[in-house]
């Protein structure tokens, strides 16, 4: 069986609303379990690949501040 994790995760959220996506992200973060990290990574990858340079710069600034805390 050839399991493509990225495809599976994207398939599972393909028809989700903005609110459902937010709930998925918030729930994964609140649970704090490492098993959710790949899914969050795939979602971040989707955000990153669809962001323009200004949006990427804003994300990087936010990330830089967050990791310094």
UniProtKB/Swiss-Prot annotation:
Location relative to the cell: Spore core
Record key words, sorted: Sporulation
A Pfam short name: SSPI
InterPro entries attached to this UniProt entry: SspI
GO terms for biological process, alphabetical: asexual sporulation; sporulation resulting in formation of a cellular spore
Induction: Expressed only in the forespore compartment of sporulating cells.
Chief site of localization: other
Family per similarity comment: Belongs to the SspI family.
UniProt cross-references to NCBIfam families, sorted A to Z: SASP_sspI
Protein name per UniProt: Small, acid-soluble spore protein I
Species annotation: Geobacillus kaustophilus (strain HTA426)
């Amino acid at each position: 069986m050839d399991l493509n994790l990225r495809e599976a995760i994207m398939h599972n959220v393909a028809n989700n609303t903005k609110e459902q996506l937010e709930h998925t992200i918030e729930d994964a973060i609140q649970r704090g379990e490492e098993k959710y990290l790949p899914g969050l990574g795939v979602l971040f990858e989707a955000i990153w690949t669809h962001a323009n340079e200004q949006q990427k710069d804003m994300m990087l600034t936010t990330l830089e501040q967050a990791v310094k805390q």
